[in-house]
Amino acid sequence: MIALTPRQIADITGGRLVHPEDARVATPVDGTVETDSRLVTPGSIFFALRGEVTDGHLFVEAATSNGAALVVAERELETTAPLVVVDDGVVALSRLAAAVVEHVRRLGRLKVVGVTGSNGKTSTKNMLRAVLGDVAPTVAPQGSFNNHVGAPISMLRIDETTEYLVVEMGASGPGEIARLVDIARPDTGVVLKVGLAHAGGFGGIEGTRAAKAEMVTDLPATGTAVLNADDDRVAGMASVTAARVVTFGQGASADYRASDIDVSASGTSFSFEHGDASRRVSLRILGEHHVMNALAALSVVGEWGVDLDRAVTVLEGVTRAERWRMEVLDAPGGVTVVNDAYNASPDSVAAALKTLAQITGPDHRSVAVLGEMAELGEYARDEHDRVGRLVVRLNVGQLVVVGHEARHIHMAAGLEGSWDGESVLVDTIDEAYDFLQGTLRAGDVVLVKSSKSAGLRLLGDRLAGVTA
């Protein structure tokens, strides 16, 4: 973070210094901003936030023991570090992030890109980090730091040397992306896809569309909206932005295009076209859906003047997004596990199942281990039903459905024609593990996919013998 004194931070956040006479309030701090006391290192700023599970105020002593140079809290506490008291910790965090981004922007070098969409945000963010980081100092979040707390923390990682800031913007309800846009004020906004992820919080897919459109509605006329031309709901956002519109997709009208896509167990390749230029791109990332993520990243960097040949070379070196995202693992006994269970939505499950079918050779068996897709609200039954039918239509050899909330996948597979044990329903991860241990054989390719809350990512690790 840029260096600021506790007094300056109090002014920015609208807070109150508890001991303004302390000489340390005039000493600049420039450490990381943390909300988890375990991540605090000497010089960090600790924001004590109240969460759904615990309260950061309970860990102020731990934070100062780890070297916190400043504590921002919602009430007075006994602490050895300077203390700023604010009315709302999340609002204070947002104000600080906005001020830091604006300060660095005024230096004249910083460009900010915001990325949103029902699927693909983290993968696209990682691609942008790789390409832009090859060009100049770049800050992008680790993991999925994309909500009202994680995104501002990521923004606060920048300093005066940062030239590119990549902000992943997620939401589970209306207005959340707009608030993040107001903090970061991106020069470029990317919308990847509108799907049913978190549909329960948006009131349906049209509510999701409106929420994702918040990314581009407030972009300045000097900015750029990068839109998926293959998704009608995203392409239609061109009518609600004052920014210049750039498109990506597989259609001939897209500004950045992909064709001739090939998916194998070693990765995904496609022909990339922009203007009159064309070249083959070979990604080491598994899944056809990553082609659109790569196109989005290439659209951003291309419009920012990065040499596209250089960008492609960097992308071809990217291996995977994060843990549990199409992570290919060699399991004991000659079994391949594709652990994609960080999260799940109807679109991402369909894409993962399609990839499973594409990479499993004719002499091997495909196995899908599926759990609940959470936060679908009234769409839950129908969407789980569709997944079950898709499994059968893709000729997946064995389906294992884990958990009561996912039962409609199993039931639909039976109605679609799965029989003689091709689909089984178990209640727990332990039961799934025991069943798979008894049925898996050399050459099997196993997809593990569920929402994070279902915990199947841990089953995928267990099957592959991963312990950390």
Predicted regions and their residues:
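ATP-dependent carboxylate/acyl-activation modules
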Residues: 115, 121, 133, 323-327, ...
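Short, basic phosphate-binding NTP loop
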Residues: 1-114, 123-134, 156, 323, ...
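Active-site beta-alpha connecting loops in nucleotide-dependent enzymes
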Residues: 53-54, 322, 342-418
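Acidic, Mg2+-coordinating active-site environments of NTP-dependent enzymes
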Residues: 10, 16, 73-81, 188-336, ...
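Non-catalytic positions within long, well-ordered alpha-helices that form the structural scaffold/packing
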Residues: 60, 64-65, 181-182, 392
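Residue-level signal for inorganic ion chemistry
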Residues: 9, 44, 63, 96, ...
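Phosphate-binding loop of NTP-binding sites
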Residues: 92-229, 235-241, 438, 462-468
